[in-house]
Swiss-Prot record:
Protein name as it appears in the record: tRNA1(Val) (adenine(37)-N6)-methyltransferase
Annotated keywords: Cytoplasm, Methyltransferase, S-adenosyl-L-methionine, Transferase, tRNA processing
GO molecular-function term, one example from the UniProt record: tRNA (adenine-N6)-methyltransferase activity
Reactions catalysed: adenosine(37) in tRNA1(Val) + S-adenosyl-L-methionine = N(6)-methyladenosine(37) in tRNA1(Val) + S-adenosyl-L-homocysteine + H(+)
Localization per Swiss-Prot or TrEMBL: Cytoplasm
Species whose genome carries this gene: Aliivibrio fischeri (strain ATCC 700601 / ES114)
The keyword tRNA processing is annotated on this UniProt entry: yes
GO cellular component: cytoplasm
Protein family according to the UniProt entry: Belongs to the methyltransferase superfamily. tRNA (adenine-N(6)-)-methyltransferase family.
């Protein structure tokens, strides 16, 4: 496993936390609507990827990144310090479910855990990062509800089955599904991921599909979405 990943404007050191840079994370970081946001919360920050992408995309925002795992928190803190935006990035080593913020957030971003109990395939921090028991969907959404502003947007990425379940739980907690993008690896395959936007305010609903690969490599839509981050994507 590579211990680092370099983007156009920042660098991710993975260290010993066992959380590699994933396509899921890059998709969410590029897709989430953080325009006109001044306060952004990154839940389960891991190496800090989503926070760094948000800082690059929105030069006016302050990003709070909350991470429970000590090793990951140290790695994210280092990545923030080495970035061009360290003054706007704050690492909070804390359990999200007991976190009390001094203000509401305009945007929340989260790549939630999705392994159900008994399905863990690995040990350690990477397994914890993907295990639903560490941050159950209902508790995650209930606490998001207390932290998000009345018109704020919360963005997530999940596999299709878990994403559909997540949306049902969200609606029970008074969230509106305001945007969804179904992600396919190729045109002929079924979607494998859902990019999900929720809000307590009923924004206009948007639905789309994103295909990552076409016959010649990466699709035009994928390149357009991620070209400001990936090297050699122009």
């Amino acid at each position: 496993m590579s211990k680092s990943f370099t983007f156009k404007q920042f660098h991710i050191d993975i260290g010993s936390c066992g959380m590699p840079v994933s396509t899921d994370g890059v998709l969410l970081g590029a897709w989430a609507d953080i325009r006109a946001c001044s306060q952004i919360l990154d839940i389960g920050a891991g190496t800090g990827l989503l926070s760094l992408m948000s800082a690059q995309r929105n030069s006016d925002a302050h990003i709070d990144a909350i991470e429970l795992m000590p090793i990951a928190a140290d790695v994210a803190r280092l990545n923030f310090y080495q970035s061009p935006w360290k003054e706007r990035l704050t690492l909070i080593h804390h359990d999200f479910l007991t976190y009390q913020a001094p203000h509401k957030y305009d945007a929340i971003i989260c790549n939630p855990p999705y392994f159900n109990n008994g399905e863990q395939s690995q040990k350690g921090e990477r397994s914890t990062a993907r295990h639903t028991d560490s941050l159950p969907f209902d508790k995650l959404l209930q606490h998001c509800k207390t932290l998000i502003s009345p018109t704020g947007r919360a963005s997530f990425i999940l596999p299709v089955f878990e994403g559909e379940l997540f949306i049902k739980v969200a609606k029970n907690d008074d969230f509106h599904l305001t945007k969804i993008t179904k992600v396919k690896t190729t045109e002929k395959k079924s979607p494998t991921r859902l990019l999900i936007e929720l809000s307590l305010f009923p924004h206009i609903y948007q639905e789309s599909t994103l295909t990552i690969h076409d016959g010649n490599g990466y699709s035009d839509d994928f390149i357009k979405l991620t070209r400001t981050f990936y090297l050699n994507m122009d």
